[in-house]
Amino acid sequence: MPILPVPALNALLTKTIKTIKTGAAKNAHQHHVLHHTLKGLDNLPAPVLERINRRLKASTAEQYPLADAHLRLILAISNKLKRPLAIDKLPKLRQKFGTDAVSLQAPSVWQQNADASGSTENAVSWQDKTIANADGGDMTVRCYQKSTQNSERKSTDEAAMLFFHGGGFCIGDIDTHHEFCHTVCAQTGWAVVSVDYRMAPEYPAPTALKDCLAAYAWLAEHSQSLGASPSRIVLSGDSAGGCLAALVAQQVIKPIDALWQDNNQAPAADKKVNDTFKNSLADLPRPLAQLPLYPVTDYEAEYPSWELYGEGLLLDHNDAEVFNSAYTQHSGLPQSHPLISVMHGDNTQLCPSYIVVAELDILRDEGLAYAELLQKEGVQVQTYTVLGAPHGFINLMSVHQGLGNQTTYIINEFACLVQNLLTSEGDKPNLRA
């Protein structure tokens, strides 16, 4: 296919960005416009990509030596699409982020549900279920299962992943992270349950954590219907979801009394509902392992990565401050409280952890600090830094080949960790200590 002249490519990109930014493409997410546009750019020669980058004033190879021209162009386009963030704009941003995130995903991960008979090796089916949140209301979870090619009875002793989406505790949903959960299920064969927890500012901390704990209790009770064992639940999440995964791991093992208190400055919860939630967490099996991806871990200390990568990338200083404020300012809890900050919780009995950070990420160093803390506590921990990657890279897994390969590698490594744990422990009962 002939390559358009650079000015024509610029015009095409400008038109695409404008269409998405203004919402003129009403159903852009359904047609996966961003996916096809950004993935297609990788077919251009590197010199052409660099010329476009210069015109768009993208970051340079000198600034980010391990980020290739294609990725730097994706970041430049993302910056063009980005709008200033403020707490009162979060509801609108939530809708736009949802549309853009789905538009980035490969169409195939949305089509395979219609062909879930197992005719393809990695066919995955999913179903949305309504369960009770921590306050007795409705909450949606999306359950993924790898389709079987025969009618044999499914095993009930496999691992299952409970996944919490990222988005600063304020944006994101089960659709925005559908591609990653679908991929984990296809690649590992595990059931995956993605949680649509309540978000700030409407529901400040620790509501999201309580909902995630309610989802954990539900999965422990219903795991066998998904072909999994309650003693083989693994936790994962990205960014804010990575924080929630770590907090859930802490609280399942050793819950603290503040979980049962009304900290949201809302009308007091019905005592019966509160008791039901408390009782649901009694004697839960502890998680087998956790996979926090570029997690939020520390709300108080500042790290070098805050200065190095605080501007011009997918998550900047202002974004982090707005998200943090929306999540914590009406919580009635200090930011150092163990229901908010994993660095201040009890990590002494935490499950084995595989902690992933991104090199070009404002949160990189606090993720590494969390891993170091776990090591000091005697927890089995592995870390992996994705070089040249920005915050939120799993949302780019199907538009950038390198990030897709890295995501595949991370899933494989975590699956190996889980398998090694099962082999070494002989699947002994895994109840709270």
From Swiss-Prot:
Coiled coil: none annotated. Pfam families: Abhydrolase_3. It is an enzyme of class 3 (hydrolase). Gene3D superfamilies: alpha/beta hydrolase. Keywords: Hydrolase, Lipid degradation, Lipid metabolism. Changing S239A: Loss of lipase and esterase activity. Its EC number is 3.1.1.3. The active site is at S239, D361, H391. GO terms for biological process: lipid catabolic process. Active at temperatures close to 0 degree Celsius. It catalyses: a triacylglycerol + H2O = a diacylglycerol + a fatty acid + H(+). GO terms for molecular function: triacylglycerol lipase activity. A motif (Involved in the stabilization of the negatively charged intermediate by the formation of the oxyanion hole) lies at residues 165-167. PANTHER family: AB HYDROLASE SUPERFAMILY PROTEIN C4A8.06C, ALPHA_BETA HYDROLASE FOLD-3 DOMAIN-CONTAINING PROTEIN-RELATED. Belongs to the 'GDXG' lipolytic enzyme family. This is Lipase 2. The gene is lip2.
